[in-house]
From Swiss-Prot:
Gene: tlpA
Side of membrane Cytoplasmic, spans: 1-11
Protein name: Thiol:disulfide interchange protein TlpA
Native organism: Bradyrhizobium diazoefficiens (strain JCM 10833 / BCRC 13528 / IAM 13628 / NBRC 14792 / USDA 110)
Topological domains, Periplasmic: 36-221
Keywords assigned: Cell membrane, Cytochrome c-type biogenesis, Disulfide bond, Membrane, Redox-active center, Transmembrane, Transmembrane helix
Residue ranges of domain Thioredoxin in the record: 69-215
Length: 221
């Protein structure tokens, strides 16, 4: 009679392959590899995809982890508050290219990233660009303000969402897999690129890419 049971030696490669696949999945979840893409696109955001394609050659070095938009995607009109507790929405910034960043004081990579975001805001903010860093601490509302003050990060505007709904809203469309999360948004509120994890936003790599996204260097591409 033929032995139909797989031998131990034949099962070993299968086990190894299963472990390898599981390990890869965990790595992707931790570092945001393979951000889920929108199955259908918003026609109003086609220009943002064209911008993403145009600046894609600049996504290297310190910003190599950026995932460029491959389908038109309008971001939710994220709701949060400013430093005075007044309500703000993402749509309040229409007309500007934005780097929307979600951060928290309990997130070590977030805290390390904040000085670079502050420097980026100082170098490029203006009529065409702004960093919108939204804190999602849910307990002590003074803690993030104290952190920014003690770190002498004075150029960033202060925005917060104590319910952390902005994170859930981005997670619902596959754009928030961990912290920090940053989305480069065009003047119409459409995704250009997304990164899960920190980046050196004050680096020359980042500055060149963002200048290109705002149109200042598009002609050079």
């Amino acid at each position: 009679m033929l032995d139909t049971k797989p031998s131990a030696t034949r099962r070993i490669p299968l086990v190894i392959a299963t472990v390898a696949v599981g390990g890869l999945a965990g790595f992707a979840a931790l570092y945001g590899l393979g951000l889920s893409r929108a199955p259908t696109g918003d026609p109003a955001c086609r220009a943002a995809v064209a911008t993403a394609q145009k600046i894609a050659p600049l996504a290297h070095g310190e910003v190599a982890a950026l995932t460029m938009a491959s389908a038109p995607l309008k971001l939710p009109d994220l709701a949060f508050e400013d430093a005075d507790g007044k309500p703000k929405k993402l749509s309040d910034f229409r007309g500007k290219t934005l780097l929307v960043n979600l951060w928290a004081t309990w997130c070590v990579p977030c805290r390390k990233e904040m000085p670079a975001l502050d420097e980026l805001q100082g170098k490029l903010s203006g009529p065409n660009f702004e960093v919108v860093a939204i804190n999602i601490d849910t307990r002590d509302p003074e803690k993030p303000k104290t952190f920014l003050k003690e770190a002498n990060l004075t150029r960033l505007g202060y925005f917060n969402d104590q319910k952390a709904k902005v994170f859930q809203d981005l997670k619902a469309i596959g754009r928030a897999l961990g912290m920090p999360t940053s989305v480069l948004v065009d003047p119409q509120g459409c995704e250009i690129a997304t990164i899960a994890g920190p980046a050196e936003w004050a680096s020359e790599d980042a500055l060149k890419l963002i200048r290109a996204a705002t149109g200042k260097a598009a002609a050079a591409l």
